[in-house]
Amino acid sequence: MAAVDDLQFEEFGDGATLLAANPDATTINIEDPSVSFKHQPRPPGSLGREEDEELLGTNDSDETELLAGQKKSSPFWTFEYYQTFFDVDTYQVFDRIKGSLLPVPGKNFVRLYIRSNPDLYGPFWICATLVFAIAISGNLSNFLIHLGEKTYHYVPEFQKVSIAATVIYAYAWLVPLALWGFLLWRNSKVMNIVSYSFLEIVCVYGYSLFIYIPTAVLWIIPQRVIRWVLVTIALGISGSVLAMTFWPAVREDNRRVALATIVTIMLLHVLLSVGCLAYFFDAPEMDHLPAAITTPNQTVAAAKSS
């Protein structure tokens, strides 16, 4: 334990006394304007170089390299390896959702928002929300269309949840897997300037599906024209994100191959959108048909009994 005298304050003498004790000491006049300090204190409220780089986004490369190194530090069979793909904050997720809803012409979604730091948190929950939005909206749509009809008996179609989940998750994972394999194969033949990892492609496809969540809710409106207008708008927004993202990856390839790749991407996207609309919302209600078919038999039986 320290002595009591060691814990007391000690008063130092003035500068003259100190210089007399050590005449060889180096002195600097802080009021001299010709003297510059290497580490000057910043005034309150000012930003340093690191804060400026963070606001301007100039230190993204260092951060992405650090994140990439963290992901490679753990083996792929460990939980910590996959945990890094869900390590995103709310701001990053909202920023990527905003980028998928408001695509910037001529801008690459991966380079602008993902920055070599793909996440699976957004795509997973976007697909899950879309599955329930389509299934619930499809049931409500059929109910509202036949509301008030005496021969209609509403039966909840829970199988639509499993069907929607199979379709959405298969599209969000299998199509990126096939596209990644194709781009990897073409990159071995033609040295492309832009290349994407599998998780970056999954991230792009996952966030591009967000526009269909409000679209599926609005599909409840029992007007076929409104539904097709909504699906056209959703296709235009999400399709432009996919086209502007993957065109730089194939434009250095053969012209026909590049165009065929983009056309295939868009056709699969159209097939998903139109297929969901046609199956979950425009499909005929089978529970309504038997009542209409048995009506003539009931009329004949009533005539015979009379």
Swiss-Prot record:
UniProt keyword list: Endosome, Glycoprotein, Golgi apparatus, Membrane, Transmembrane, Transmembrane helix
Assembly and binders? Interacts with YIPF6; this interaction may stabilize YIPF1. May also form a ternary complex with YIPF2 and YIPF6.
Which residue stretches are annotated as topological domain Lumenal? 141-162, 222-227, 278-306
Q: Which residues lie on this side of the membrane: Cytoplasmic?
A: 1-119, 184-200, 249-256
Composition-biased stretches (Acidic residues): 50-59
TM ranges are: 120-140, 163-183, 201-221, 228-248, 257-277
The organism of origin for this protein? Rattus norvegicus (Rat)
What is the official name of this protein in its record?
Protein YIPF1
Q: Which GO terms describe its cellular component?
A: Golgi apparatus; Golgi medial cisterna; Golgi trans cisterna; late endosome membrane; trans-Golgi network
Carbohydrate-modified residues = 297
Location in the cell reads:
Golgi apparatus, cis-Golgi network membrane; Golgi apparatus, trans-Golgi network membrane; Late endosome membrane
- Biological process GO terms, please? vesicle-mediated transport
Topologically, how does it sit relative to the membrane? Multi-pass membrane protein
Q: Does the keyword Glycoprotein apply?
A: yes
- For the region Disordered, what residue ranges are annotated? 33-59
Q: Molecular function terms in GO for this entry?
A: small GTPase binding
Q: Which family does it belong to?
A: Belongs to the YIP1 family.
PANTHER family attached here? Answer: PROTEIN YIPF, PROTEIN YIPF1
Stored InterPro entries: Yip1_dom, Yip5/YIPF1/YIPF2
